[in-house]
Regions:
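Conserved GNAT acetyl-CoA-binding A-motif
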Residues: 120-124, 138-140, 167-179
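Conserved acyl-donor/pantetheine-binding loop and adjacent beta-alpha core of acyl/acetyltransferases
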Residues: 46, 60-152, 200-202, 217
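Active-site rim helix/loop that mediates acceptor-substrate recognition in acyltransferases
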Residues: 13, 18-49, 55-58, 68
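Structural signal for hydrophobic/aromatic residues that build the beta-strand cores
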Residues: 52, 142-145, 164, 175, ...
Length: 218
């Protein structure tokens, strides 16, 4: 899954976070290992992972896409999100300053759209080949959505997003996403609407979008 995440991010932000100037023959595998470690840590912290697999001709199962969803905070109930964030060992190939700027920008976008307490009751947050997505107390939060480039346009991304939308709809909550140019058409096709001007994310335009289920407010 760490390799898949790296393949899904081969262009755009991946080149900013893992610039050529920091790449060496000795650290080429650090990026996938770092992504895998972050995924496993989040799983151990109690987050929910939803995985799409593709059965190969030989009967093996090849992961072609995955999404990782955070459930919303329940009032009065302690959750892993209440604990101090744990730092992962960052690889030498990662531009730590660029990662810090990225997180700062994403936080500002989410606070502007969701309000200062928006993160407190997030359902899920997503950063992916298709999108960077956030969902709040109004919403769901898709932590990670990645689809192997060799298997895109086969419906895997739609399945992963649809799953989270169904969870949010069951609770009568909205879904807020920050969509990359690659992900925007998918979200538009699934009923999301732009709610603000595009935002520059380290040189790449991203669009804040919102989906409101028919059950919202009922």
């Amino acid at each position: 899954m760490g390799v898949l995440g790296t393949r899904a991010f081969q262009d755009g932000l991946n080149r900013v976070l893992f610039p050529p100037r920091l790449q060496t023959p000795g650290n080429k595998d650090e990026g996938p290992a770092w992504r895998a470690a972050r995924i496993l840590r989040r799983m151990r912290e109690g987050r929910t992972a939803y995985v799409v697999v593709d059965a190969a001709d030989d009967g093996s199962e090849t992961v072609i896409g995955y999404a990782q969803w955070d459930r919303p905070k329940v009032p009065g109930q302690d959750t892993p999100q209440d604990e101090p964030a744990k730092e992962d060992d960052t690889p030498s190939s990662l531009d730590k300053e660029a990662l810090a700027r990225l997180n700062e920008i994403l936080d500002k976008i989410a606070v502007t759209a969701l309000g200062p307490d928006g993160f407190q009751s997030m359902w899920c947050r997503c950063s992916a080949s298709l999108t960077n997505s956030y969902i709040s107390n109004l919403n769901s939060d898709l932590v990670i959505l990645s689809v192997d480039p060799d298997h895109q346009r086969r419906g895997a991304g739609r399945m992963l997003v649809q799953w989270g939308m169904e969870q949010a709809a069951a609770e009568g909550k909205k879904v807020f996403v920050i969509a990359t140019p690659e992900g925007k058409p998918l979200y538009e096709a699934m009923g999301f609407e732009a709610i603000a001007d595009p935002v520059d994310l380290l040189g790449f335009p991203n669009q804040a979008m919102l989906w409101i289920p028919t059950s919202y407010g009922s």
